[in-house]
């Protein structure tokens, strides 16, 4: 049984009020990682999970919300399709090209699967592939923003991933936790939900430290909290571990967007979160900060 650690609110008020306001969120970005989409034993797609994910997203649309899905999985699905088990950097002449080739195969397959399931719920979905330049270049950013706005007006759910085949993978945005927060800031979302292979943020990696305590709410991302993720690596399938989730939290909360990390083992948590239930770790958006998105993305890997 996990020990829950509830951070006191600044004014001592009940943390429940932060959960209550989740009921009113209108524009929601949901991110799912590769490890959550696959069966861990075989690496094949978990269709049951994908089905529940799509159903939850369509139901959010039916509740009148604007919804974006940021999905990983292109490389993992591509690797499976061309029968590559491991991309070992020391054994490949050009490991990045191998990953990019896998992404080219896998992205199309992944979208095919999503399109099929979204169609079952009579929901139109779109694909948006982004690179660092989509945000840094003013005209690109303006066009991307307008495209999202039009898709929302049309009731379409945009499905986003990094354009791994043209991005220099690992030195551009590189992970979808960060990408999802960037997307949330770009579209002026009011909630970002990261579905992970863990319940939320702990005081330390609970897989390494049995005494790690669960943190229910983070009202202020202190340096101490940011350091909590730095040593982490995450699963063998996932890219960023907790570090990239905390970077995402920094981007989101500085843009006044609430963010939640929740466990993807039961994707039905999505509607429960929107019902104000106490699930996952909630990072509270900060109204007082100004966040310069293009500036941040331009300097991302220099920080
Ligand atoms: N402080 C922490 N709190 C929670 N999980 C942590 C922490 N530090 C490291 N981790 C690890 O990060 C993992 C989640 O990252 P990752 O595997 O990249 O997830 P995903 O593929 O879902 O994005 C957890 O399974 C956990 O082992
Ligand atoms: N863009 C890559 C995923 C990168 C990524 O961040 O993966 P993950 O840590 O599983 O969310 C892909 O689609 O394979």
Put a short name on every predicted segment.
Residues 2-124, 128-303:
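C-terminal catalytic "cap/lid" subdomain
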């Amino acid at each position: 049984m996990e020990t829950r650690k509830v951070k006191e609110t600044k004014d001592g008020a009940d943390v429940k009020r932060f959960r209550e306001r989740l009921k009113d969120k209108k524009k929601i970005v949901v991110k799912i990682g590769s490890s959550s989409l696959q069966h861990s034993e075989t690496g094949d797609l978990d269709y049951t999970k994908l089905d529940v994910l799509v159903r939850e997203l369509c139901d959010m649309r039916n509740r009148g919300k604007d919804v974006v899905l940021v999905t990983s999985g292109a490389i993992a699905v591509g690797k499976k399709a061309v029968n590559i088990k491991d991309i070992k950097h020391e054994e490949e002449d050009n490991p990045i090209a191998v990953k990019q080739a896998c992404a080219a195969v896998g992205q199309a397959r992944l979208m095919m699967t999503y399109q099929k399931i979204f169609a079952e719920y009579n929901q139109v979905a779109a694909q948006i592939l982004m690179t660092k330049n989509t945000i840094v270049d003013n005209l690109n950013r303006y066009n991307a923003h307008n495209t999202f706005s039009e898709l929302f007006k049309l009731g379409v759910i945009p499905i986003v991933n990094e354009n791994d085949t043209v991005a220099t993978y690992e030195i551009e945005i590189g992970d979808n936790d960060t990408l999802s927060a960037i997307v949330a800031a770009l579209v002026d979302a009011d909630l970002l939900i990261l579905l992970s292979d863990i319940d939320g943020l702990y005081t330390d990696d609970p897989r390494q430290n049995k005494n790690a305590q669960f943190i229910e709410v983070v009202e202020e991302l202190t340096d101490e909290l940011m350091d909590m993720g730095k040593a982490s690596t995450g699963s063998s399938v996932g890219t960023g571990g907790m570090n990239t989730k905390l970077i995402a939290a920094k981007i989101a909360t500085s843009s006044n967007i609430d963010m939640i990390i929740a466990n993807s083992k039961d994707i039905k948590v999505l509607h429960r979160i929107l019902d104000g239930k106490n699930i996952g770790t909630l990072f509270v958006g900060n109204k007082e900060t100004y966040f310069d998105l293009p500036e941040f993305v331009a300097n991302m890997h220099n920080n």
